[in-house]
């Protein structure tokens, strides 16, 4: 006998599935040739999403378009994450470079948060664009977010400013309260990226996958001297270690791998070589979801494979010095002015932080604490001190290990110490 009517719950589920759509946002939060790795991995992510079947009109791409014409770029108009010393390499820009929705002039906290929050009128006001690309998603849709930049405990860099953990949580909460998505995956590449999501409420239905925990640095990969494509040296780090591994995995297993498998295998691979703890936060029940919940259902084309063993890994805080040293080595010139200036700037910042530590902890305790991390400390205090070092003293991100160690030691008490920043 034919059933007169389909089960209402089953019918609702099928209709919801039919109406559901997938959207993605890719943000590079920085500019400059030293940050080539953020440009290249963001571009690779865009290419992978397109290959997986996400239509271009369902992807928002904000990144530094000036990287293509950067004077130091040996391959203008191209972007590579992987070296290929004697071959043509894998150029990601062949797909991404014609699809910038927002460029370097738009990389500001206000615009990023407005785009993420789907506030079209605010984006219009801030950008001057008549028809800016802003999504208007529904409670049936899924959203994938990728953000790559420098970070610190409690936030990430965005252009010449910062986006705080609180601001990101507020944007996600606003979307959730407006029923603008069913599920969200947020991938964050930044030093101390775990600090942005370590208190993320599970009820927001967001799965956060970060390159590091709340206190550790992220690492760059394929840095000089392993920075060559077809005989030309890039003179910078080509990509980020965490990104290369998870992108390799989803490129080869995009139709079968789950969020949890992607996390665990990336975590384990990175942990074999570095003290960089890839982490996960938020709604961890989403670990069993296939990656195709957020990316397309088509297999991503497998191309050049990342070697099983990484090449020339450099902590993100040390990239400028590493790059300057190799520029001096390769040039053969006696002029070491660029390297000298960087070494002086780093020494100045170290002295200022050591003076701060000595004034609060005393010289002997500061000297003991500067080479090892304090595991128990007040994170709100640390965030305040890090922000003051940037705002009052002009220190730059990412902070080197010694700065982080001294700040953590200072913040081992309950209260934020009184500091004269003059």
Locations of regions flagged by a protein language model:
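Short, Lys/Arg-enriched N-terminal segments with co-localized hydrophobic residues
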Residues: 1-5
């Amino acid at each position: 006998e034919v059933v007169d009517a389909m089960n209402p719950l089953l019918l609702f589920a099928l209709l919801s599935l039919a109406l559901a759509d997938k959207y993605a946002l890719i943000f590079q939060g920085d500019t400059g040739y030293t940050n080539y790795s953020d440009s290249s991995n963001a571009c690779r992510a865009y290419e992978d999403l397109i290959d997986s079947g996400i239509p271009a009109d369902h992807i928002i791409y904000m990144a530094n378009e000036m990287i293509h014409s950067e004077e130091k770029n040996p391959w203008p108009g191209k972007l590579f994450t992987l070296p290929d010393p004697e071959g043509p390499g894998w150029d990601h820009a062949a797909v991404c470079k014609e699809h910038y929705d927002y460029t370097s002039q738009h990389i500001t906290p206000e615009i990023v948060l407005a785009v993420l929050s789907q506030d079209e009128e605010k984006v219009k006001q801030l950008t001057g664009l008549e028809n800016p690309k802003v999504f208007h998603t529904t409670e049936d849709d899924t959203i994938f977010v990728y953000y790559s930049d420098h970070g610190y405990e409690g936030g990430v860099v965005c252009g010449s400013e910062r986006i705080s953990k609180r601001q990101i949580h507020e944007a996600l909460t606003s979307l959730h309260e407006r029923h603008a998505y069913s599920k969200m995956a947020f991938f964050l590449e930044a030093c101390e990226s775990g600090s942005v999501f370590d208190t993320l409420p599970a009820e927001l239905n967001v799965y956060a996958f970060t390159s590091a925990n709340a206190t550790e640095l992220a690492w760059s990969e394929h840095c000089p001297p392993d920075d060559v494509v077809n005989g030309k040296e890039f003179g910078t780090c080509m990509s980020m270690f965490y990104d290369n591994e998870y992108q390799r995995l989803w490129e080869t297993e995009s139709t079968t791998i789950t969020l949890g498998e992607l996390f665990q295998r990336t975590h384990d691979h990175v942990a074999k070589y570095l003290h960089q703890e890839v982490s996960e936060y938020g709604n961890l029940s989403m670990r069993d979801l296939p990656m195709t919940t957020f990316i397309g259902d088509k297999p991503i084309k497998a191309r050049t494979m990342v070697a099983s063993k990484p090449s020339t890994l450099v902590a993100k805080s040390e990239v400028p010095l590493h790059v300057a040293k190799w520029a001096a080595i390769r040039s053969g010139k006696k002029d070491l002015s660029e390297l000298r200036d960087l070494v002086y700037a780093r020494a100045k910042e170290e002295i200022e932080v050591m003076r701060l530590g000595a004034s609060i902890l005393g010289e002997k305790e500061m000297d003991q604490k500067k080479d090892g991390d304090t595991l128990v400390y007040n994170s709100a205090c640390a965030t305040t001190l890090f922000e003051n070092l940037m705002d009052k003293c002009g220190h730059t991100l990412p902070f080197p290990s010694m700065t982080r160690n001294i700040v953590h030691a200072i913040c081992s008490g309950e209260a934020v110490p009184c500091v004269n920043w003059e």
